[in-house]
Amino acid sequence: MTIEQMFDIIESGGETVEFSTNVDMISVCNADGSLRPLRFRFADRDQTIRRVQVLEVLACREIKYVTVEAYEYTCQTRMEERDVLMRLRYAVRSHRWSLFLERN
């Protein structure tokens, strides 16, 4: 997947997950125990390392399924000199961060 294809997915919005991957995250644990993502990196499908700065956390919601406990963050980010809205998910039991990009 090229960076242009990633931006096509990001800018189109939608409900169907087109691309998801685990990411290396730098985050802050606040005094109240809440997490705040700061920046992350990931390898795209072409194995190119992409670095992303989190500019602002717009929303955070708790996700609870039968065996899954996670927090989903909607963030304003900067990648490749562009501001992009992204969803990040933190899985509590595995301590893993994931990035989700969507398309209609």
Q: What spans do the regions from the language model cover?
A:
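Cysteine-centric segments in proteins
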Residues: 1-104
